[in-house]
Curated annotation (Swiss-Prot):
Residues 265-340 bind DNA. This is Nuclear hormone receptor family member nhr-6. The NR LBD domain and the nuclear receptor DNA binding domain are sufficient for binding to the NGFI-B response element (NBRE) 5'-AAAGGTCA-3'. Residues 1-18, 125-134 have a biased composition (Polar residues). In hermaphrodites, expressed in the developing spermatheca and dorsal uterus. Expression includes the 8 cells of the dorsal somatic gonad primordium and the sujc cells that form the core of the spermatheca-uterine valve. Expressed in the precursor cells of the spermatheca-sheath lineages (SS cells) and in the precursors and descendents of the dorsal-uterine lineage (DU cells). In both hermaphroditic and male animals, expressed in a pair of head chemosensory neurons. It holds the Pfam family Hormone_recep. The gene is nhr-6. It is found in: Nucleus. It comes from the Eukaryota. Residues 589-600 are annotated as: AF-2. It comes from Caenorhabditis elegans. Disruption phenotype: Reduced brood size, abnormal egg morphology and arrested egg development. Defects in ovulation with fragmentation of the proximal oocyte and endomitosis. Misplacement of ovulated oocytes into the gonad arms due to a lack of spermatheca-uterine valve formation. Degeneration of gonad tissue. Decreased spermatheca organ size due to decreased spermatheca cell number. Disorganized actin microfilaments in the spermatheca, lack of distal constriction and defects in spermathecal cell differentiation.
């Protein structure tokens, strides 16, 4: 738009003598004023966002000395006064916008290039023409106010402390792309903490990235009706609650407790082994449950060989029965729950006075094979010293001790699952072939680091020097093995039970040297136990290899035991079981094995009579 020409003093008479309609000026008619207003409105609506210093430049141009002074004329018309009042209102509006923009915005001052990009249409000066404002002028001004309604509302709204707050730190007026110049006092982002006074159009995006409409009643609720805090004091308290660590929680996925917490609840209160449910008033494993039950039913009395402070855990819980029973009582196991007499056929329950009726009503899940075998080991192991023999004794007492060990070993093996399914004839052959090796394993487990004494299943403690000469070699070799036995493998009940079972099945060779009548059944039992041990040692293949190697090493005790029996046989009446053992074939289990000569010492070398398939193919 061309800049309005400045009127000279020569036109003063013309203005004074002519009507406003006859004045030859760009502002002399109502249409010219409306055209300029229309241009201004179109620029605001269609052009790029207004720069920050736009109103400052407009105010600077309007404050320059004009070519027409409204005050120079004495009797001015009402139209001139109306024009002067309108211009003054617009100037006041521009000044207010500039002041509020300077107070709120902290963006850097626009560069020289941005200043030079101001459209030329806005570099004009206000006209000093004197004319009468028609009624359409007021309508045009009202139209401008309606177009700039969001901006004007900031000054027409009642006082509110929220709108006097500082603008958001990321507010940038140059980044606005609305159809109008927004209120500088409002933040440029949509926040539930600031009331939004702009109508939401159909082209705007909702909180979920989908198009929302102002007519939609099921979309995002209006921030004016939100329950969130809408004032700075409330907002500070609202945000402060998120900064308090006490208000924050760290639950696991889907509200499920962590695995560590679940494992801690499934530990036996007596020996820290795996426990599934409550037994007799406390969470205990199956082994401690059976031990406590047998102790109460048989009214057993135990004595401690130490100072009554023996450690009770899953490795050494069978070492001292006295301390184990005392710990059962300490953790809350109740003797009254154990079934006696006529109660043996139904679940034992406490009376209403004890209020512990849920002790044994919870059924236990089925246990795996090695767990059942480990339970049999614990049920048939005695770790309590009953008598001590430090004086030398003869061969008859030695045979009585060995005979008692044989019956205890047979009872233990018959209590193990799978092994008890073997036919009696084959069971007797395998027991005779593995008896001395199994006795050495159990002695090593009972003796520990003892160097001068040995304890048997009967609870009798003997000095090494008290044994007859024919048993000295095998007994001392047992004690030597016991010194390092506990440190070779982590002997929990499952691994220890599998070790004994594999030692019992050592005579089952590929060529059936022992002459088993139902070898396929024995092969099936042996394969089942090996697979169970493989699964049990899945996290430590080294442990599996150690157990297999120890099975070969302990097989040498069979030859040592035969040497002692061969010495006693001519002069002593041997029990029937020992006679069966002596008459058992002594053919080597493998072609590389040779039977030892009678009376010759046998060194505990790595070679053995055990024909067990080593390597990955066996597992």
């Amino acid at each position: 738009m061309e800049q309005l020409s400045i009127q000279t003093d020569e036109l003063q008479d013309q203005f004074s003598n002519c009507s406003p309609a006859s004045v030859d000026s760009s502002y002399s008619s109502c249409s010219s004023v409306e055209d300029e207003i229309e241009i201004y409105t179109r620029l605001v609506r269609n052009e790029e966002p207004l720069r920050r210093d736009f109103f400052r430049e407009m105010s600077k141009n309007s404050s320059c000395s004009s070519s027409f002074d409204y005050g120079e004329f004495g009797p001015s018309s009402s139209s001139r006064k109306g024009s002067k009042t309108t211009d003054a209102d617009l100037d006041s509006l521009f000044h207010s916008l500039v002041e509020t923009s300077d107070q709120v915005n902290t963006v850097p001052k626009p560069t020289k290039t941005e200043v030079e990009s101001i459209p030329e249409e806005f570099e004009q000066k206000p006209s000093s023409s004197s004319h009468r404002l028609p009624s359409e002028m007021n309508a045009s001004i009202t139209h401008i106010k309606s177009e700039l309604d969001p901006t004007m509302q900031a000054f027409q709204m009642p006082h509110n402390d929220l709108f006097l707050a500082t603008a958001a730190p990321h507010y940038n007026p140059f980044a606005l792309s609305n159809d109008f110049m927004p209120n500088p006092l409002m933040p440029s982002f949509t926040s539930p903490f600031y009331p939004q006074h702009f109508p939401v159009s159909d082209s705007r995006r909702g909180s979920q990235g989908t198009t929302s409409s102002s007519n939609n009643t099921g979309g995002t609720p209006s921030p004016h009706s939100s329950s969130l805090p809408t004032s700075p004091p409330q907002l500070q308290g609202f945000l402060r609650s998120f900064l308090n660590p006490d208000n924050l929680s760290t639950p696991t996925s889907f509200g499920v407790p962590s695995e560590t917490a679940l494992d801690a609840d499934k530990m036996c209160a007596v020996c820290n082994d795996r426990a599934v449910c409550l037994h007799y008033g406390a969470r205990t494993c199956e082994g401690c449950k059976g031990f406590f039950k047998r102790t109460v039913q048989k009214n057993s009395k135990y004595t401690c060989a130490g100072n009554k402070t023996c450690p009770i855990d899953k490795r050494y819980r069978s070492r001292c029965q006295y301390c184990r029973y005392q710990k059962c009582l300490e953790v809350g196991m109740v003797k009254e729950i154990v079934r006696h007499g006529s109660l043996s056929g139904r679940r034992g329950r406490l009376s209403s006075k004890t209020k512990l009726a849920r002790s044994e009503d919870q059924p236990s899940p089925p246990l795996p094979l090695l767990a059942l075998m480990g339970k049999a080991i614990e049920d048939h192991t005695n770790m309590t010293v009953v008598r001590q023999f430090m004086q030398p004794f003869d061969e008859t007492i030695a045979l009585r001790i060995l005979h008692g060990e044989l019956h205890a070993t047979k009872k233990l093996l018959m209590a193990m699952p799978q092994i008890s399914e073997i036919q009696p004839a084959d069971f007797q052959i395998l027991l005779s072939r593995s008896f001395f090796a199994i006795m050495a394993i159990r002695v090593a487990n009972r003796c520990g680091n003892s160097t001068d004494t040995i304890m048997f299943e009967s609870g009798e403690l003997f000095s090494l020097n008290a044994f007859p000469a024919c048993f000295q070699q095998i007994i001392r070799f047992m004690v030597d093995k016991a010194r390092t036995f506990s440190s070779l493998v982590d002997w929990e009940p499952q691994a220890f039970a599998a070790f004994i079972a594999l030692q019992f099945l050592a005579g089952n060779t590929e060529h059936n040297v022992l002459g088993l009548t139902n070898k396929p059944l024995v092969d099936q039992v042996q394969s089942t136990i090996i697979n169970a041990l493989k699964d049990h040692c899945s996290g430590s293949q080294n442990k599996l290899a150690k157990i297999v190697r120890l099975t070969q090493e302990f097989d040498v005790f069979h030859a040592l035991g035969l040497q002692a029996l061969d010495i006693l046989y001519p002069s002593h009446q041997l029990p029937e079981e020992f006679m069966f053992l002596i008459n058992l074939t002594r053919a080597p289990l493998r072609s590389t094995d040779a039977p030892p000569a009678c009376g010759s010492p046998v060194a505990p070398s790595g070679s053995s009579l055990f024909n067990f398939q080593m390597g990955p193919a066996a597992f």
